[in-house]
């Protein structure tokens, strides 16, 4: 199964295409747009500025990740917790693509994503 992942909960816009099979999970393509330089002068992340930067970057990142790759079978997107402006950009981009491509959309909790990300490297026995 090919999954398009979208993450925009704070100050980075991240998009990745994953091949998830019984043999493992493989990153086919990934792009990240950092906002560190944008927020540096403010001493922290400014939610409104972050949201605008996500809106500017998300479509070009999705296009770049999908270029020359297989079409996704599903889309996974961070729905929270996080900064509402960034989350709205990511969720609406994911919803639009899901509708246009007629593929499933799965919401991912940001904190749970961190917890389960350790399984990318090594399967955890429960």
Protein language model regions, located:
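Short acidic/glycine-rich loops and adjacent helix/strand connectors
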Residues: 1-126
């Amino acid at each position: 199964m090919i999954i398009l992942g979208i993450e925009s909960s704070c100050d980075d816009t991240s998009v990745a295409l994953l091949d998830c099979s019984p043999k493992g999970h493989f990153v086919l393509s990934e792009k990240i747009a950092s906002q560190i330089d944008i927020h540096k002068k403010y001493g922290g992340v400014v939610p409104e500025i972050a949201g605008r930067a996500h809106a500017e970057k998300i479509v070009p990142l999705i296009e770049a990740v999908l270029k020359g790759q297989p079409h996704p079978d599903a889309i996974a997107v961070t729905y929270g917790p996080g900064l509402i402006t960034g989350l709205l950009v990511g969720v609406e981009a994911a919803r639009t693509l899901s509708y246009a491509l007629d593929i499933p959309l799965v919401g991912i909790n940001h904190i749970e994503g961190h917890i389960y990300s350790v399984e990318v490297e090594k399967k955890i026995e429960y």
